[in-house]
Regions:
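Catalytic pocket-lining loop regions of alpha/beta-barrel enzymes
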Residues: 1-107, 159-167
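Mid-to-C-terminal alpha-helical segments outside catalytic/metal-binding sites
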Residues: 95-96, 100-107, 116-167
């Protein structure tokens, strides 16, 4: 729709990020490709890891082949909640996506507070920290450095750990 494209152009001009969850599977991928072509400098974060448990999810992941698109994994533990911690299916999916677009295009997300009904906040990232399937560098990139680069966050600041109420 022209009004939405106008809004996306304005977001691009103003440096506003677009954080978006698409319809399950590949349904909205062609429309998102149009937005990416029209607004090549609009920073886009595709949410919920492309709805990884639904057929066609990899089409959403492939959007990250564009320089301005990242994939965030908020909700991935919810999507793999049936298998529960340590979410081996989620780890496998992240590795598949990394093979497709590179680990530098993927960002961790908690989907907090929704996930507090099923897991602790620590569990939402601990399954990555404790898996032997990622290198230490991949863990650092996925758990924070990629997001810091994408959103322009200064990682030089040393913040103290604050215990979360759900731990």
């Amino acid at each position: 729709c022209p009004e939405m494209m106008e809004m996306f152009r304005l977001m691009e001009q103003k440096g506003v990020f677009l954080s978006i969850t698409l319809e399950d599977g590949a349904v909205q991928v062609p429309e998102m490709e149009e937005v990416i072509q029209e607004c090549p400098d609009l920073k886009i974060a595709v949410g919920h890891f492309g709805m990884v448990t639904v057929p066609g999810w990899m089409e959403q992941i492939r959007l990250a082949r564009h320089k301005n698109v990242m994939i965030e994994s908020g909700g991935i533990t919810w999507l793999f909640n049936d298998e529960f911690y340590p979410f081996k299916g989620a780890v496998k999916a992240i590795l598949q996506a990394a093979d497709e677009v590179g680990i530098d295009k993927l960002m961790w997300g908690s989907d907090y507070p929704r996930t507090i009904t099923a897991i602790t906040y620590r569990m939402s990232y601990d399954f990555i920290l404790k898996t032997p399937d990622f290198t230490e560098e991949s863990k650092e990139l996925f758990l924070g450095l990629n997001a810091a680069r994408f959103y322009g966050i200064n990682t030089e600041i040393d913040l103290p750990y604050i215990k979360n109420m759900s731990e």
